[in-house]
A protein has these predicted regions:
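Structured loop/turn residues at beta-strand edges in well-structured enzyme cores
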Residues: 31, 44, 64, 115, ...
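A flexible loop/linker signature enriched in serine peptidases of the S9 family
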Residues: 1-35, 50-57, 72-87, 100-112, ...
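Short loop/turn segments that connect beta-strands within beta-propeller blades
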Residues: 40-44, 92-96, 141-145, 185-189
């Protein structure tokens, strides 16, 4: 590439116009955004569901009617300046219409939907601008829009929630370098350890 200054560059100049352009362990991030696509179980072409200059973060959780999914995203205009901030959104698969389900300062992510489609388990925290904050396990009632924290008594970061029927949530947390799997009722209460020392 000729520079006009009598110097020839081996590689083209990289123009960066985004706040988030590089990540530890990944290097320069490719341009573009992460979006949801669907493919028929019969096969065929993928169809894009979400659009715009925002990332829609995996995993997405299907509702039982297969008409919508719940996913974490930051759809604010200044999303690049709030890298931790995500909310849960319900997205209509046919229209791409979004409905915000959570709203707080801090990340909400990793949704898991109950088999009856009435509740969503997820993890996140109220961002107090600290160096590290534990992710709390919460459950959202889709009809009322209210959320309740289920792991407030646990001084560990809850991750990977999965519904155990409609009555309980199974999740994991790291404890002294080892993974523990635990279970808590959807209505709250004591956390019961299911397995420890999982690596």
């Amino acid at each position: 590439v000729a520079t006009g200054l009598g110097v020839r560059l081996e590689k083209p100049v990289k123009v960066i116009d985004k706040v988030l352009y590089r990540a530890d362990g990944a290097g320069y991030l490719p341009p573009g955004y992460a979006h949801l696509f669907v493919v028929s179980s019969e096969g065929g072409a993928a169809r894009q569901v979400t659009r715009g200059d925002h990332d829609f973060n995996a995993p997405a959780a299907w509702l039982p009617d297969s008409r919508s999914v719940i996913v974490a995203a930051n759809l604010d205009a200044d999303a690049d300046y709030k890298p931790l901030e995500t909310e849960l959104y319900r997205i209509d698969i046919e229209t791409g219409a979004t409905i915000r389900l959570t709203q707080r300062s801090g990340p909400d992510r990793a949704p898991a939907v109950s088999p009856d489609g009435r509740h969503v388990a997820y993890v996140g925290f109220d961002d107090r601008k600290l160096g590290y904050q534990n992710s709390q396990l919460s459950i959202l009632d889709l009809a009322s829009g209210t959320s309740r924290v289920l792991s407030a008594a646990l001084d560990r970061s809850a991750e990977a929630p999965e519904l155990d029927g409609n009555e309980a949530i199974v999740f994991e947390y790291e404890d002294r370098g080892s993974t523990t799997v635990a279970r808590v009722a959807a209505t709250g209460g004591a956390i019961r350890i299911l397995a420890t020392d999982l690596g």
